[in-house]
Amino acid sequence: DRSVSRGLGDVYKRQTFTGGEPTLRRDLVELVEYSRWFVTRLNTNGILLTPDLCRELYEASLDSVQITLYSWDSGIHDSLVGRKGSFHGTIEGIRNALNAGLNVSVNTPLCRDNQDYGKTLAFLNGLGVRYVTCSGLIETGNASSGGSVSSQLSVREMGEILTAAADICRETGMEIGFTSPGRAEVKLLKRLGIPVPMCGACLSNMAVTPDGLAVPCQSWLGGVVLGDMKKDSWKSIWNHAMCKKIRAMGEEESLFCPLRTGKSEKGGDT
């Protein structure tokens, strides 16, 4: 709570509860309600989104919930998640969130195993989902291993998927976003009417770990700590040397995720 309350007199206005898996916290509803003067969002796999929890989150004024679904195919989803049976839990969570009146979006990290994204969009449309986002895999944590990196889609492959996805969304009235800097060509995204993603670490967003430590973004899982939100001033965190270094990136550099290991293939105008 102290980390949240420090934002009241400082500069940030949006609060996202993410993880790990934030629905494991028994005090999640309390934290959301405590943060009601922020624009609040919950990022989750959806498995623990019971009807009661969704109702409580709605009553606590949660502004939106983003649920991750890897595929319309239960086998593919469970394989990528690494847990058999997780697909059905996630789908039930999506249904419960929609039924509770929550503002729901569904994110799909794309790779070679789930590149039939059009079928996932059709499936989500059938559930009543109106807002979707997709991304490449972020090379952090377990996804930084050789197998995960090799499953990344090329810029060309991602472009083909996005082109088809944009057509489907226009036909169904869904809205689509793309969140991976450098994973798709800028010109293509502009032509499709999809906002061009740029790295916002240490500028438009930072992350706070469960023990109150500030890090550049939610995917930056190790190596850099910008300060302790429980005791350090926001000014000292904002002016940390790493923050300044990241914010000093030029426009071309910000079209890439700093965590990306291979940057030879550009997603810019080339």
Name each region found by the language model.
Residues 25, 50-51, 74, 117-118, ...:
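Structural motif corresponding to alpha-helix initiation and N-cap regions
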